[in-house]
Amino acid sequence: MAKAKFERVKPHVNVGTIGHVDHGKTTLTAAITNVLAKVYGGVAKDFASIDNAPEERERGITISTSHVEYDTPTRHYAHVDCPGHADYVKNMITGAAQMDGAILVVAATDGPMPQTREHILLSRQVGVPYIIVFMNKCDMVDDEELLELVEMEVRELLSEYDFPGDDLPLIQGSALKALEGEKEWEDKIVELANALDSYIPEPERDIDKAFIMPIEDVFSIQGRGTVVTGRVEAGIIRINDEIEIVGIRDTTKSICTGVEMFRKLLDEGRAGENIGALLRGTKREDVERGQVLAKPGSIKPHTTFESEVYVLSKDEGGRHTPFFKGYRPQFYFRTTDVTGDVQLPEGVEMVMPGDNVKMTVTLIAPIAMDEGLRFAIREGGRTVGAGVVANIVA
């Protein structure tokens, strides 16, 4: 059985380094791969190969990101590191690199700096659930009291953004010294790895979450009823399951009387699979692209939300001019566009291409959404921005 085979594989956890420029994020990333390769086996990566991050395009947005992997005895980690601040902003907002937890790097020589704060705020907005702190460059600070002061500052800053600042793990170390092979500092990297293992819970697999499938297409089959097709985003749908059809119109209920894939009938459809679901008693005209099939009660339709948005630069194919409050583009959620009205924060008069901004959006039709849902902003089919739902208002 395929499932039994999968269980032998270590749980897979996605993490990343965040923090102010030049505080040592990339050096730490290199140190983790080197020390853990030495201690637990695996492949070491040097600073230059991580720092020379390849450019990727996610939804038309250019992002430079380095991906490294490492293992602890119980887990396999995929770790992202970005060279520039703008890359972090884009990465976190588009969800190109979903993080189950982040390692916040703060130089003990500087303490928290503007981007430290900005990355913590972004983590809160986009729903990074856990943060572990690595205080770097501690070999350069002789004064024990100064280290305590910086630790206190970092913890207070995290608490300010609703992270458990007093309780989360904070490791004082030196990424450079660990990379140079000094045992005392290498041990701090192992301590960091242990903190990742113990503090970040094993992420729930998509298949174990509540069932949801965005509807891509609808057609009727003579004598059998209405079939909706799409890719199962999470969970499992089985024959005779009750489901809700959510978004755009009033929520309705139906029963799934059949699941098919490549014209073969199945007992169930699982996360990641492209399926057709046959719905009992649902008419072809009652369902449309852009709605979702979902486990009853698991997701609600909403029209108004606060979001964190990155606006594409002109070079990325975005707008050439700024926009102002009352801007009415299309918001593309999962499989469909819905027009929405934009309100900007107090004191923000206009938004320039290349900016990131917090905005409140009111859609003209409700969409099934939870906090953390990603969307694109489009004008006439062209993507001009990317965003994430930070807070649902109504």
Curated annotation (Swiss-Prot):
Protein name: Elongation factor Tu 2
Gene transcribed to yield this protein: tuf2
Region (G2): 60-64
Region listing for G5, in residue ranges: 174-176
Enzyme's top EC category: hydrolase
Chain positions covered by the region annotation G1: 19-26
Domain tr-type G, chain residue ranges per copy: 10-204
Binding annotation for Mg(2+): T26
Stored Pfam families: GTP_EFTU, GTP_EFTU_D2, GTP_EFTU_D3
Gene3D superfamilies: P-loop containing nucleotide triphosphate hydrolases (3.40.50.300), Translation factors (2.40.30.10)
Alphabetical UniProt keywords: Cytoplasm, Elongation factor, GTP-binding, Hydrolase, Magnesium, Metal-binding, Nucleotide-binding, Protein biosynthesis
Catalysed reaction equations from the record: GTP + H2O = GDP + phosphate + H(+)
Entry EC number(s): 3.6.5.3
Region (G3) location: 81-84
GO CC terms of this entry: cytosol
Domain of life: Bacteria
Compartment(s): Cytoplasm
Self-association state and partner proteins as the record states: Monomer.
Annotated spans, G4: 136-139
Signal peptide: none
Binding site for GTP: 19-26, 81-85, 136-139
GO MF terms held by the record: GTP binding; GTPase activity; guanosine tetraphosphate binding; translation elongation factor activity
Role, per record: GTP hydrolase that promotes the GTP-dependent binding of aminoacyl-tRNA to the A-site of ribosomes during protein biosynthesis.
Lineage: Bacteria, Pseudomonadati, Pseudomonadota, Gammaproteobacteria, Alteromonadales
